[in-house]
């Protein structure tokens, strides 16, 4: 079940086409409501079915456009796809924006179920081809897309993964530390010691160690990190507060799941057409660490994904100088136009070659789309 807002036709200047934007409210799997935007390309109808995608955001609670520093990459991709004849829905994460539910206690697997609910909703729409529904996932959203692609019963028909993790979250965190301290020119012996302390903390979290063990491991890591960056060390009270805050972060259900979840087994069971993009200068999900598991794993896949490294692109697929997050806001380009074109061209090509559910005979009149009452508007 879902409620609709009034359909609003929006013309995109210079494109010579119009799309229909609807506000929607989808029932989630945990009693939560997922508020979002349903974007239909011009001409979509029960007599002219169109492919569609679900957008899945990266880590941290985010809105439907994956807004960051004023950039709205998901809106840009959705608009580009609509102009190519592809419908989409993009929803606020549970517990964020207009969506309900407890996002702070949700894990990757809860967001996976939310994505499946959105795919199911699309399959129920009379304008959408149920055999041509895919996902576009970024970062953690790419991991969720990977998990949805599994044989023998994939949850969708194709996927675009943008900067998907290929290693566990724990290894990603250690790798980020390694990159950061390397850029700071920390001596190799000191760097190795700090990374070992980080791995010991990760191992303790995965082993579900008791609070005392986690506290000792966190304190050892904080001390090692401070030795790399702070001379002299801050006051003891400041260090203790840092340890306390760190423990709170790693104790959340989401973080524990993220740290332990290894994508490698899932990569070997990809069963739908897939486009995987990495940014050459991504320092959050670096291709140097995350690409090799895909290159190795797809050797056993019944369907071989297309993998592309985008030159000079950062984690948000902006053209970048260093790829560091402190550049994101300063870069005026929302998302590299070549990335938009690559995604659009691949989705159009893939759906054009897939089986379709296009009607071939007479069809009854489509059901009307009710305007939402003030109470049911998301």
PLM-predicted stretches and their roles:
Residues 7-48:
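N-terminal cap/lid segment of alpha/beta-hydrolase-fold proteins
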Residues 76-98:
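Conserved alpha/beta-hydrolase
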Residues 142-153:
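Short glycine-enriched nucleophile-adjacent loop
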Residues 160-269:
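Accessory cap/linker subdomain of secreted extracellular hydrolases
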Residues 105-126:
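Alpha/beta-hydrolase active-site loop
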Residues 283-289:
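Conserved alpha/beta-hydrolase "acid-adjacent" motif
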Residues 48-58:
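Short beta-strand element of the alpha/beta-hydrolase
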Residues 270, 276-278:
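Short beta-strand/loop motif that positions the catalytic acidic residue
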